[in-house]
Amino acid sequence: MAPSSKSERNSGAGSAGGGPGGTGGKRAVGRRREHVLKQLERVKISGQLSPRLFRKLPPRVCVSLKNIVDEDFLYAGHIFLGFSKCGRYVLSYTSSSGDDDFSFYIYHLYWWEFNVHSKLKLVRQVRLFQDEEIYSDLYLTVCEWPSDASKVIVFGFNTRSANGMLMNMMMMSDENHRDIYISTVAVPPRGRCAACQDASRAHPGDPSAQCLRHGFMLHTKYQVVYPFPTFQPAFQLKKDQVVLLNTSYSLVACAVSVHSAGDSSFCQILYDHTALPPAPPSSPGPWSPEAAPAFPSLGVEVVPAQPSGAPEPSPAIAKAKEFVADIFRRAKEAKGSPLEETRLPSSLGPSSSRCRPSLEPQAPSGEVVPRDSPPAAETTAPEPGYINYTKLHYVLQSGEGTEPEDEFEDDKISLPFVVTDLRGRNLRPMRERTDMQGQYLTVEQLTLDFEYVINEVIRHDATWGHQFCSFSDYDIVILEVCPETNQVLINIGLLLLAFPAPTEEGQLRPKTYHTSLKVAWDLNTGIFETVSVGDLTEVKGQTSGSVWSSYRKSCVDMVMKWLVPESSGRYVNRMTNEALHKGCSLKVLADSERYTWIVL
């Protein structure tokens, strides 16, 4: 190939002469070739193709936004976010508010059908965060699940950074609280299904007349406190149809699905009681060494489960072993054994025990469900005290004012949802699927109580449990989610008060310590298991902010060190307006899978 610049010609000449310039030329050419080869080799290892190899795209798939969108829409304040995973749509949003400080922000999301050689065609417009009083501009993130293309989820984050005291007075809040707004919206269908055609005939001329499967909207709002939970869409949406929400006090797994009346294929997504461990002794428990590869990438110490060949002990035996194990542990500590040596054999109980309902102090001893019990007994197993499960079906009612509001007012644990269709009509919640006609939307919520879990782990599994006084604050980070086994691995950072170790003479007052607890939560059974318990690290002169900053950095380092890349199609697509809040704009909207750019 002929050199395209003077420097390359000189490099080539040096190469021909074999002098010093030639050596440098060979190095330069070799370095460029080696770079490409290394990149292609990395594709084999990671399964992902770096977009840096193809920054210069052919002009036929590189179009200007001004050429495909009418100026009226640009003047109306449309902020374009990016391509959908399928490449069929480009998404944008608008925000509007009044001129005074007491006006609310109103957000709308838009789907535009994209064709390279024609202008964008608007196919859907919806209002986000139904009827919420939003007083400041939000950080927006629009996400798509790895394989579920039927809906998108929109997160709105309020950072409390605007108008200071006026904002606090109006919202009766302070800088220690932040509002989280969420809307889940059905994606426009490629073609009109039979139910959509029926809706169009019932409401001629109304573009929002869609069936529930292709035209639902679900909204909720909750408030988080300091230390504000990290936003982890890659983990929170890793399981299709499910979103994990950290509310600061609990981890809520929400599953959203649409079904038709009389559909025999209805399948419960969360908290399926029939997924309890089977009876054969050769089948290990969920966290026995044989089952440990559920999280192969994290390399953490898994507290061993009971041997697979051993029978399940009765509740009385479990409590007796727990008592003996506590005595054994205290004796080991009195002899000055290292902390890592005080973890007990699996046969002795607390370190290897699953947190079953039978181990709760207020639970009767007969609540444990034996592994060899019949299926009927498994389906009637009581809920562990640290979880709450609800399932509501939302249906569209023709009559107004018939919703039984009082039936659902007493539930203070589950997140409140408002479900509407595209025409703005509210859907009525029902607990049973009886007497349903047409389509209905099902919302499942499985809630894990953080403080309950913390107390249980310290009580059963912490070697320093006898030193523990109380915890003052905690922070939760999701380390991994396995969509095949429905296991969620979380890290709980703790600030706590505890008495010093017995070896420290004269120390009678408790000190402040930091530690972390790793816990695996099963979305099928609701049961959690202790993976590992960290040692106590004394907090000396550090602020809580510096403690949480170091803790989160350690979590990021752990996740990145053991990260196993997903296949190119198994990623969470994420679009955000972060650039707008930084005072700049995106340069391009890129569809990396189809090598298409829209230049802004």
Curated annotation (Swiss-Prot):
Biased composition (Basic and acidic residues): 334-343
GO annotation (BP), single: regulation of natural killer cell activation
Pathway in which this enzyme or protein is active: Protein modification; protein ubiquitination
A Pfam match: DCAF15_WD40
Phosphoserine modified-residue sites: 50, 314
Biased segments, Gly residues type: 14-27
UniProt keyword annotations, A-Z: Immunity, Metal-binding, Phosphoprotein, Ubl conjugation pathway, Zinc
Biased composition (Low complexity): 344-359, 374-384
InterPro entries documented for this protein: DCAF15, DCAF15_C, DCAF15_WD40
UniProt subunit comment: Component of the DCX(DCAF15) complex, also named CLR4(DCAF15) complex, composed of DCAF15, DDB1, cullin-4 (CUL4A or CUL4B), DDA1 and RBX1.
Function per UniProt: Substrate-recognition component of the DCX(DCAF15) complex, a cullin-4-RING E3 ubiquitin-protein ligase complex that mediates ubiquitination and degradation of target proteins. The DCX(DCAF15) complex acts as a regulator of the natural killer (NK) cells effector functions, possibly by mediating ubiquitination and degradation of cohesin subunits SMC1A and SMC3. May play a role in the activation of antigen-presenting cells (APC) and their interaction with NK cells.
Protein name: DDB1- and CUL4-associated factor 15
Native source species: Mus musculus (Mouse)
